Amino acid sequence: MTVSATADGPAGTKTATGRVVRVIGPVVDAEFPRDAMPDLFNALHVDVTLAGGEKTLTLEVAQHLGDNLVRAISMQPTDGLVRGVEVRDTGSPITVPVGDTVKGHVFNAIGECLNLEPGETLSPDDHWQIHRKAPAFADLEPKTEMLETGIKVIDLLAPYVKGGKIGLFGGAGVGKTVLIQEMITRVARNFGGTSVFAGVGERTREGNDLIAEMTESGVIDKTALVYGQMDEPPGTRLRVALSALTMAEYFRDVQKQEVLLFIDNIFRFTQAGSEVSTLLGRMPSAVGYQPTLADEMGELQERITSVRGQAITSLQAIYVPADDYTDPAPATTFAHLDATTNLERSISDKGIYPAVDPLASSSRILAPEFVGQEHFVVASEVKRILQRYKDLQDIIAILGIEELSEEDKLIVGRARRIERFLSQNTYAAEQFTGMKGSTVPIKETIEAFKKISEGEYDHFPEQAFFMCGGLDDLERKAKELMAEG
């Protein structure tokens, strides 16, 4: 059954056929000719028959065991796979389609399109291997640049870095999906850019809901989606982020576009790596994680960066197991993050959207050398006022606001106005709220919050600050409310 190389693989490379000698769940051992052993990370194909139907499984070579044996991890369930069947080396790693044709479509980790209509075919610009090197040091963008989103709370208090990685924290129902859709819309409108969404090990229902909501809001045509959900084998969940990142790299490097890459959830990437590591028989490291945790995370994160002119900016939803921030999985992720955006239920309960916690969110570029002295000073003052308001909450709850000093009463009034002015209508929610989304330039945001902090708008009613855009919008609403009052 073990045969020498006869078939032509990609780019004319000779490929070999072998036979399956052992199957243990998603782990498959195969024997190949000594002179035609497949390389590490090469994709292997096996035809299996199950319930009267035929399908082709894709495996990825993970280890060379000696005695002409390789150990591979399956990217699909191995039901129907038996010893002795032929296995073919494709001669290259897993490849995925790239280019404009992937927009509006859903793919799995091995590049198969999952939402083609009957009779519809996909004609991609090219196919790229998912295992790629990070950009060379000489090609990286030397300057640190802020990604202006037009969302006041983010731009002022936790600004994003072009080509940076942002951690997105938040439970169910606090507006995470809306924020994701909003960023996709803004990148397309403001930069003419593209978004790629990687669903890594999350619920199939959530993935389906996201597709439906994106279709309804019209952003699906600007987005490519790659899914490896929690019912998939660990090999798929480990590779789906790389498949999505490869599509994003094509938009950045070939089409010279700004790209937004969403990974939901980066913890599941680590979790899948732990499962694969155990299946391969490696000795576990701290808390049972794989010994290669930092290496695997680095290989993914270092490819997400700015090259000269264009950038892949990544928003990564992060699940923190048992809220333990010292757990190796989130701790390893934090080392790569440039900013964090915390979505807080107590803020969404007030009807303030985006429900970003201004005190818990942070950014490494919120410093004078990156954003300028005025931006830094205004942001610091806004945080100081909000922190003082938070400190006074218990006193207000027990004794009432009348018991505060005159200075503290002023701070509470300004904090409540700031809190409401941090809310903003979004493009993604236009069809639900009936109110048009707004983009506020960073200069206007800084000017507005400076005036609020200094008390210039203390005479404006609090309601005027709620869900408005820039200064013009605020002053118009205030005049209307004061005229009514």
Swiss-Prot record:
Its EC number is 7.1.2.2. It is found in: Cell membrane. ATP binds at residues 170-177. Its main location: membrane. One of its GO terms (cellular component) is proton-transporting ATP synthase complex. F-type ATPases have 2 components, CF(1) - the catalytic core - and CF(0) - the membrane proton channel. CF(1) has five subunits: alpha(3), beta(3), gamma(1), delta(1), epsilon(1). CF(0) has three main subunits: a(1), b(2) and c(9-12). The alpha and beta chains form an alternating ring which encloses part of the gamma chain. CF(1) is attached to CF(0) by a central stalk formed by the gamma and epsilon chains, while a peripheral stalk is formed by the delta and b chains. Belongs to the ATPase alpha/beta chains family. NCBIfam families: atpD. PANTHER family: ATP SYNTHASE, ATP SYNTHASE SUBUNIT BETA, MITOCHONDRIAL. Produces ATP from ADP in the presence of a proton gradient across the membrane. The catalytic sites are hosted primarily by the beta subunits. This is ATP synthase subunit beta. It comes from Salinispora arenicola (strain CNS-205).
